[in-house]
Structures are given as structure tokens and as C-alpha cells.
Swiss-Prot record:
InterPro entries: Znf_C2H2_sf (IPR036236), Znf_C2H2_type (IPR013087). Its main location: nucleus. GO terms for cellular component: nucleolus; nucleoplasm; nucleus. It comes from Pongo abelii (Sumatran orangutan). This is Zinc finger protein 501. Gene3D superfamilies: Classic Zinc Finger.
């Protein structure tokens, strides 16, 4: 065997060694590349060798650190060709694109409602299960979403860190500020595919869409009457509890609905 044949055989052997799958000794999972196995094994060891110089957060992969650093730099390299909106990660861009395409791959097994994002489906499913995993340490009130708990906690602290540059109004969460700013800009990015009506908030669009579908997700536990909105169920439930939270400061009379209080106050104004 000459030197060129030996060299070819050695090269062929290295290719075969590289292609041979590597097995994780902890969980038995196979990987085609040794580097992928090395990254995977950090899950078992809890090893996070890539450290953010800005805040000290640690990561298992260099790619995860690179993605995280965009929080500090504000870099958003992934741009939507439809609306020019930009994002920090490709995954978020893919989710955003479904707003334009109308694709909703995540479907609820209970009611068939579909969503463009997996987290939206998980949040929705809590309507059916009644699960409220996020609990306030101050008052014990529980919530189905972490963002609702965060917003609620600011009701105890009074913190409103998000301020409108146009009018100075402050809010306890950034989403509320973004929604408010659409009053000034006139932007209504959420459009009904049935009738073309546009809304400033996605939640308003979701509620509106139920007028077309007839869907009523919110059910009274006392009389089983159903409603399209949680707010309507809450108002209805006061019939059973007798609660009248809206009090007239003029005469002390109380009402179940704010609209009833307003009508009553006009009687005083006309006196």
C-alpha cells in the first residue's frame, strides 16, 4: 500500500469516526456531532460557561449569550418584510409573521380555538382549567398569568415606571403604555378578517371576533349563563352575590354597574 492509499484510508477513517453518533452517558440521547454532545452534557452538570459582562447572567451556549446581549445593546437584527418591525431573535420574528399570514398552529383541545403562539394557547387553556399558578405574596390573590401578577403587585407599591412622552401619563406596565400611545398615533394594528374593523389592542380584537363566532367562554357557576367577556361575567355575578361596588358620594346609594351609577348621578346634577 502506497502513501497516498494510506492517507486516503486514514481520511476515510476520520470521516467515519465523525459520523459515528455519540451517546450521552446520563440520558442515552445520541448526537451526530461531538460538539453537540458536549453542549448537551452541560444540562446534566448545570455548567454555564458563557457569562454576560453586563449583568452576570450565565448560559450554556455561546449563541444563547449572543442572543441575550441584544437586551443590553438594543440590537434587533431580524426584520419583518411586511411591516418593518424588528426583533432580537429569529424565533420571535417567526411568531410575529403569523399575524400577517393568519397561521394559527396551536389549537385548544377543549374548544378548538387556535393561536399563533404556544404561550398564548397555554394561557388560554387556564380559562378551562381555572388554574392560577401566580400568587401575590401581599394579599394572596392568584392569577393565571405572570404578567397579571406583576401588574397587580404594582397596585400595592403604586409603581408606574412607564411614562408617555406625549402627555406625561404613567402606567404600571409597558404594554399599557404602548396601547395608550396608539391614542396619540391613531394606530390600529389589529384587524378583523371578517369585517375589516381595526383595533388598538389585540384583546379588543379577540373580544370583537366573538360577535362573529358567537363564542361565549365565560360561564356563571351559579346559573350557567355564558358570556363573551370576563368583565360581563363579573358584572352578572353581582346579581348572585348582591355586591354593589359603585357608591354615590352624594346620597350613599350603591349600584352593581358603573353605568347605573352614572345615570343616577345625572339625577343629582339635574336637581
Amino acid at each position: 500500500m502506497n502513501s497516498s492509499q494510506i492517507s486516503l484510508k486514514m481520511k476515510h477513517g476520520r470521516v467515519n469516526m465523525q459520523k459515528k453518533p455519540s451517546k450521552c452517558s446520563e440520558c442515552g440521547r445520541f448526537f451526530t456531532q461531538r460538539s453537540s454532545l458536549t453542549q448537551h452534557q452541560r444540562i446534566h452538570r448545570g455548567e454555564k460557561p458563557y457569562v454576560c459582562s453586563e449583568c452576570g447572567s450565565c448560559f450554556r451556549k455561546q449563541s444563547n449569550l449572543t442572543q441575550h446581549l441584544r437586551i443590553h445593546t438594543g440590537e434587533k437584527p431580524y426584520k419583518c418584510n411586511e411591516c418593518e418591525k424588528a426583533f432580537q431573535t429569529k424565533a420571535i420574528l417567526v411568531q410575529h409573521l403569523r399575524i400577517h399570514t393568519g397561521e394559527k398552529p396551536y389549537k385548544c383541545n377543549e374548544c378548538g380555538k387556535a393561536f399563533c403562539q404556544s404561550p398564548s394557547l397555554i394561557k388560554h387553556q387556564r380559562i378551562h382549567t381555572g388554574e392560577k399558578p401566580y400568587k401575590c405574596a401581599e394579599c394572596g390573590k392568584a392569577f393565571s398569568q405572570s404578567v397579571c401578577l406583576t401588574r397587580h403587585q404594582r397596585s400595592h407599591s403604586g409603581d408606574k415606571p412607564f411614562k408617555c412622552n406625549e402627555c406625561g401619563k404613567a402606567f404600571n406596565q409597558s404594554a399599557c403604555l404602548m396601547q395608550h400611545q396608539r391614542i396619540h398615533s391613531g394606530e390600529k394594528p389589529y384587524t378583523c378578517t371578517e369585517c375589516g374593523k381595526a383595533f388598538t389592542q389585540n384583546s379588543s380584537l379577540v373580544e370583537h371576533e366573538r360577535t362573529h363566532t358567537g363564542e361565549k367562554l365565560y360561564k356563571c357557576s351559579e346559573c350557567e349563563k355564558t358570556f363573551r367577556k370576563q368583565a360581563h361575567l363579573s358584572e352578572h355575578y353581582r346579581i348572585h352575590t348582591g355586591e354593589k361596588p359603585y357608591e354615590c358620594f352624594g346620597c350613599g346609594k350603591s349600584f352593581r354597574h358603573s353605568s347605573a351609577l352614572l345615570r343616577h348621578q345625572r339625577l343629582h346634577a339635574g336637581e
